[in-house]
Amino acid sequence: VGGMSTAPYLSTMISEKIEVARIINAIKIIQRTTNLPISVDTCRAAVAKEVLELGVDIINDVTGLKYDTMMPKIIERFCPSLILCAYSKKIITGNQLQETKQLLKKSLEIAKTAKIPRTKIVLDPAIGFFRKKGRNPF
């Protein structure tokens, strides 16, 4: 479930308040109809905190814990499963496989520092993202 598009080539930033409102409405509907795990896409710690308090199972951070410095603390506190995407503010050039690997290593280092268990982490190479100039600040 996402409240804000993460399309890197569009200007899609919205306020945290709007993002939370969109996600919470969707979560409540899903929770009324199923017991399946719920994953939320967000790179903002305040949003993650709100949805984790509602019982969300997975956080998918397209920035690999690199956008919001508070995100690792929130993940450590609630201990959900975590999807880390290969993320760079710069355009990935050269050997994309090697650069993607390094980006994921950096995210894993951030997670390790925050004592996030590796068994809770899924890595996403984010192929198609950050391969050319984007318009989002994250």
Q: Where are the language model's segments positioned?
A:
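Catalytic cores of alpha/beta
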Residues: A45-E53, I59, L123
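Alpha-helix-loop-beta-strand connector modules within alpha/beta enzyme cores
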Residues: S11-V40, E50, R77-Y87
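Glycine-rich, proline-tolerant flexible connector loops at the mouths of alpha/beta enzymes
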Residues: V1-N25, I127-K133
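Generic structural signal for well-ordered alpha-helices
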Residues: I23-I27, A48, T69-P72, K101-E109
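Catalytic alpha/beta core domains of metabolic enzymes, predominantly
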Residues: T93-F138
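Acidic (Asp/Glu)-rich catalytic clusters
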Residues: L52-E53, M71-L82, K115-P117
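Hydrophobic faces of well-ordered beta-strands that scaffold small-molecule active sites
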Residues: V1, I38-V40, I58-N60, P80-L84, ...
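Catalytic beta/alpha-barrel core
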Residues: T34-R44, D57-D68, A86, T100
